[in-house]
Amino acid sequence: MCQNENCNCKKPYYITTAIAYTSGKPHIGNTYEIVLADSIARFKREQGYDVRFQTGTDEHGQKIELKAEAAGVTPKQFVDDVAGQIKTIWDLMNTSYDKFIRTTDADHEAQVQKIFKKLYDHGDIYKGYYEGLYCTPCESFFTESQLVDGKCPDCGREVQPAKEEAYFFRMSKYADRLIAYINEHPEFIQPVSRKNEMMNNFLLPGLQDLCVSRTSFTWGIPVTFDPKHVTYVWLDALTNYITGLGYDCDGNNGELFEKYWPADLHLIGKDIIRFHTIYWPIFLMALGLPLPKQVFGHPWLLQGDGKMSKSKGNVLYADTLVDFFGVDAVRYFVLHEMPFENDGVISWELMVERMNSDLANILGNLVNRTISMSNKYFGGEVRNGGVSDAVDEDLKNVVLASVKKAEGKMNELRVADAITEIFNIFRRCNKYIDETMPWALAKDEAQKDRLATVLYNLVEAITIGASLLESFMPDTSKKILAQLHAQKRALSEMDQFGLYPSGEHVTDAPEILFARMDLKEVMEKVEAMRAAEKAAQPAAEEAKEEEPVIDIEPKAEIEYEDFAKLQFQVGEIIACEAVKKSKKLLCSQVKIGSQVKQIVSGIKAHYSPEEMVGKKVMVVVNLKPAKLAGVLSEGMLLCAEDADGNLSLMVPEKKMPSGAEIC
């Protein structure tokens, strides 16, 4: 950053999003973050900053390794495909990022290895053993006390016991320093509720050292001096914010790093704020680097009454919504519906409502009416007639005040509120039309200059509003200004009213910006789309490559009479718990007809007790009772086992009552 106070160069501003995890196609909730960051980056450019906007993909980890294996491809092939999908959607949404980093980039991987070695050499990283509860989707270890109802506190999924050799980072060494920093910099974690959560739930109770390597999978960045270990996700993923700028822990930093670090804003989802406000600043302290100026944990965009997830079947994708509404409309929906701190809700019904009331009516109809009246009454010419009224001053005051309010809201990252201020300009313009009644003025030749003044004021106000709208709806902003034959107004000039050149002409063929939509027709299309997707699933399954087969050592043949001695029935699991003295066993209460049998099974590594309850299973009913780990078992649950030792319970294909005979 330039240190010369007399220099006219722009002040740097570095904004980042969390890098997207390449486990699958991003939904609109994921897409919200990149659109939010883009609107902030664009507005900062309008404010005169030299903006660096970075996003990208997080491409290592056990979850990806497993997904790639299931897809029959290498992990690199898998992440190449998903990263391509993510980048395509980011580009579709017209995001103006400067850098798209991938954690599989060679320069990033090289720096992560050097950072790991440097921290190890300094004594911040040491080798030990980790034994705890592991959540594979989150790639995080937890203690028993950190679980919520026995499940992962971040995603709510099941956790599994795990023990392995690992390297650890001495978090506790820097805890007091971080607490002091947060107290001295109240702006560091925003909103304030996120700060209170981090302090009260994690920092003040005491930090545990952090596992920073894994040996149970291979898809990661190897530790150079101990290659059976791969770097654990957060030391890999978080460092993208500096490696993407050309950071070199040997001191040979690139120009971008020297110019833009520390980051002005890390924009992330509230679910990963712990990693960005505890782990990341401590890593930076250990490296001797300044901390980012602010971490903002934005709320979630919900569909209906819950967070979007494929497992819930409530996922909306950006490209699907764009097909229905267009890019700028989708940008408007997600930005407008997201409050500063609380979760926002999006639905098809709400989007159609916003399309009709806000975009088609308040904005689109205003622009069309103004241009049409200018063509009808003055052949498209827009001139200031110089005949003013008190209502004109009120219009001007509202417009100029809304500009200041919108900028103030953006400085606070209250993007939805800023958009509301911009639309207040358009609302005031519509009211101004009702107040001045241009159609009535047009009937009186003596009011011609007054009519010209009214239309000039409308074009000027819309020009300011459209210019301010560019950060949020860039294509719409350009379309409006093009139809008005207006130059985009710089933010620094928006403290003035009346800069539109008198005598300019608007287009003689105004374009409809947003067409009204019929909710019934939209929902019919949505249902047809869902039906087509559902119908395509079996076809997709059939199109998959032939699954591998397993050959096992055959056992001796038996007579039918021997087989007939076994009694197989359908059972319903009504209760289940782990066997305390065993790491492998679950004890299930199985309802078989009118009786209930207790059955112990070695499936703890494959099913949680909660998953078992309610399942219909196939049971060998008449096995002689036996004790396993001291617990009585009165039967056997039938399972299949693949070549890797994964077990799957045998369940009826169709709905069958408890007690039905298997024959």
Predicted regions: what they are:
Residues 2-55, 107-111, 161-376, 418-422:
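Structured secondary-structure scaffolds
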Residues 2-82, 101-116, 121, 138, ...:
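N-terminal catalytic cores of NTP/NDP-binding nucleotidyl/phosphoryl-transfer enzymes
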Residues 82-98:
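A glycine-rich helix N-cap at a beta->alpha junction
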Residues 93-102, 120-133, 145-146, 160-163, ...:
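Short secondary-structure capping/junction motifs at helix and strand boundaries
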Residues 127, 350-387, 398-506, 620:
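Helix-rich, typically C-terminal accessory recognition domains appended to large enzymatic cores
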Residues 541-663:
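Phosphate-backbone binding interfaces of nucleic-acid-interacting proteins
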